[in-house]
């Protein structure tokens, strides 16, 4: 079994914001794999499917970003899954819009959703895809930036990054992660 988690904030007012790019990627994976995300468990919306006989779960925590761990850990426990089976997708201010980075483990890097996951899982040793959303513009706060929408000139780049991240997430279900990293980094 594999669990692919996209981080974001619940509610229509956050749709399309930089902070919700994890949700956008999970939605793209769902379209690629023909999985409906409409079931509810562990404070999250999820869907399930199979790839080459292996069960795959897609999860969008509904706890708000800074409490994401409150959804992911119970979900893993319910299905008796290990942290090794987890891939987390989230926004990263330190990467330009359109860039993605895959890592086998790492720190929270100041990201509150990742801080929550690390605290609730008791480890930072889980796979992740960081999707670049760039730094705030001069005079713009981090909160304004991540809860804001993409500028028109960024839309093509973020769309490509979402598609590439979805492709990488699908590859995670089929191949060793080191191979996936070598392909997509």
Swiss-Prot record:
The active site is at residue 19. It catalyses: an N-acyl-L-alpha-aminoacyl-tRNA + H2O = an N-acyl-L-amino acid + a tRNA + H(+). It is an enzyme of class 3 (hydrolase). TRNA binds at residues 14, 64, 66, 112. InterPro entries: Pept_tRNA_hydro, Pept_tRNA_hydro_CS, Pept_tRNA_hydro_sf. One of its GO terms (cellular component) is cytoplasm. The record marks 9 as: Discriminates between blocked and unblocked aminoacyl-tRNA. Monomer. The record marks 91 as: Stabilizes the basic form of H active site to accept a proton. It is found in: Cytoplasm. Its EC number is 3.1.1.29. Hydrolyzes ribosome-free peptidyl-tRNAs (with 1 or more amino acids incorporated), which drop off the ribosome during protein synthesis, or as a result of ribosome stalling. Catalyzes the release of premature peptidyl moieties from peptidyl-tRNA molecules trapped in stalled 50S ribosomal subunits, and thus maintains levels of free tRNAs and 50S ribosomes. Belongs to the PTH family. This is Peptidyl-tRNA hydrolase. NCBIfam families: pth.
């Amino acid at each position: 079994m594999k669990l692919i988690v996209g981080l974001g904030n619940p509610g229509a007012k956050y749709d399309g914001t930089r902070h919700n790019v994890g949700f956008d990627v999970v939605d793209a994976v769902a379209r690629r794999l023909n999985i409906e995300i409409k079931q509810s468990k562990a404070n999250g919306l999820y869907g399930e499917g199979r790839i080459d006989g292996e069960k795959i779960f897609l999860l969008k925590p509904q706890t708000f970003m800074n409490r994401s761990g409150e959804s992911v850990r119970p979900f893993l426990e319910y299905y008796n899954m290990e942290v090794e089976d987890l891939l987390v997708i989230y926004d990263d201010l330190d990467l330009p819009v359109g860039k993605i980075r895959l890592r086998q483990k790492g720190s929270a890097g100041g990201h509150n959703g990742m801080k929550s996951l690390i605290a609730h899982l008791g480890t930072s040793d889980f796979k992740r895809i960081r999707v670049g959303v760039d730094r705030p513009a001069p005079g713009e706060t981090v909160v304004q930036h991540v809860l804001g929408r993409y500028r028109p000139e960024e839309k093509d780049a973020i769309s490509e990054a979402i598609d590439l991240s979805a492709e990488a997430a699908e590859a995670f279900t089929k191949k060793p992660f080191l191979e996936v990293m070598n392909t997509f980094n």
